[in-house]
Amino acid sequence: MEPDDFDSEDKEILSWDINDVKLPQNVKKTDWFQEWPDSYAKHIYSSEDKNAQRHLSSWAMRNTNNHNSRILKKSCLGVVVCGRDCLAEEGRKIYLRPAICDKARQKQQRKRCPNCDGPLKLIPCRGHGGFPVTNFWRHDGRFIFFQSKGEHDHPKPETKLEAEARRAMKKVNTAPSSVSLSLKGSTETRSLPGETQSQGSLPLTWSFQEGVQLPGSYSGHLIANTPQQNSLNDCFSFSKSYGLGGITDLTDQTSTVDPMKLYEKRKLSSSRTYSSGDLLPPSASGVYSDHGDLQAWSKNAALGRNHLADNCYSNYPFPLTSWPCSFSPSQNSSEPFYQQLPLEPPAAKTGCPPLWPNPAGNLYEEKVHVDFNSYVQSPAYHSPQEDPFLFTYASHPHQQYSLPSKSSKWDFEEEMTYLGLDHCNNDMLLNLCPLR
C-alpha cells in the first residue's frame, strides 16, 4: 500500500518517532512481532505480546545507556565468522552470535572455529552512519513501540535456538569419550574375584540383639544402635553374684552369648525365686514420671494386674517384666545370682533403709562397685508416706519391721506387691538376707 492511499489518521500513526512526547493511542491494529527488523523499521506491538515484552531480536543486540529512562536503547554487535571462510556440512558458512559481555567477546575471538578449527574474527555492525544499528523500545499505554535506525551491513548470525542446539550437539559428541574414561576408572577400582575388602572399608551396624563380637584389632567405622544399647545398659550394667562372692559384668557375657539364650538362662536361674517383674516398680526412665503413676502401679499390683505387661519400653527387645531380677539368692551356689542395682550412689540418698534387718549377720553383704559416671539419669521416685508397709531408717532399729516367719499366713508375693519400691528401695536389695 502506497503512502498516498493512507488517510490523515493513518499518516499520523506512521509519522510518529520514538522520541516524541506523545505517541498515538488510536491504533486499530497492532503488528506481528518481527524477528529480523531492519532498514529503519517501525512497529507497534500489543502490550500483551510476550516477545515484545522481552524485547527480543534475532540480531545480536546489547543494552546501551540512554538519557531517556522511558526508552530502552539497544545496539547491534555484528557477527562472528570463520577466518578461513569455511563451509559447514549443510553448505552454509559459519556465522556465530557475538558474546554480549566485552571480556567474553574478546575471549570468544581467541577461540577456534567449531567447523574447521580455524581462527575466528568479529565483523562489527556499521549500518547507522558508521555506528551500530540501534533499536529503541518504549512502553506507552496499551502498546509497545519499536523503532530501528540503520541498516545492518553484515550477515545474520545464528539464532539463539540454533546456538543452543549447536552446543548440545557438541556435548553429545564429547560425551562418549568422557563415558569411556569413567568406565575405565570404574574397572580399575573394581576388586578382583579373589580379593576381599578390608574391614576398614566396610561400615558395620551393631546392635545388642545381634550379639556380634568384634575382633580386638578392628579399627573400622562402627555405627552403634545407641537408643537400644543405652536402654539395655541400664538394665544389664551390673549384676551381683552371691554364690561366687564377686561382681559379674553382664555386658561382657552378652557380647559372646546369644541374647535369647541369655534370656532363657536367666529365666531358668530365677525360676526358683520370685521374679521382680511382679514385685518391683519399673526403674527405666520414662515409664513412671511422677508420684501419681507410682500410686497407680501400686493399685494395679494390689488388684493382681501387671501394669508393665501392657506397656513395654520401646527400646527393649523384651518387656521390662520379663527380666528376671530376683530377690533371694539361688539355691545352687554355682549359678550367678543377678540383681538389679541402682545407677546412683546409695550414700547420696538419705531415705534408703534396708528392707529388713539381717539377723544372720553379714552373710551376703559385700561391697558392690557402681559406676557413678553413667550418663543415664535415673528418675527419683518418692514412695507414698501413707503406705502401711513403708520401712524406716536404719538408724532406728526399734521401728524396723521384722521378717515374717514361714508360718505367717501372708504370702510373700502378696506382701511385696503392696510395697511401693522405687530406685531408693532398690538400694536396700544390696543387703538382702535370705527370705526363706
From Swiss-Prot:
Keywords: Developmental protein, DNA-binding, Metal-binding, Nucleus, Transcription, Transcription regulation, Ubl conjugation, Zinc
Post-translational modification comment from the UniProt entry: Polyubiquitinated in the presence of UBE2D2 and FBXW2 (in vitro).
Location (main, coarse): nucleus
Binding residues for Zn(2+) 1: 76, 125, 152, 154
DNA-binding region: 14-169
Tissue and organ distribution: Highly expressed in the placenta. Expressed in trophoblast cells of the villi.
Any one GO biological process: positive regulation of DNA-templated transcription
Entry binding sites for Zn(2+) 2: 82, 86, 113, 116
Pfam families: GCM
Cellular component per GO, a single term: transcription regulator complex
InterPro entries: GCM (IPR039791), GCM_dom_sf (IPR036115), GCM_large (IPR043020), GCM_small (IPR043021), Tscrpt_reg_GCM (IPR003902)
PANTHER family hit by this protein: CHORION-SPECIFIC TRANSCRIPTION FACTOR GCMA, GLIAL CELLS MISSING RELATED/GLIDE
Protein name as annotated: Chorion-specific transcription factor GCMa
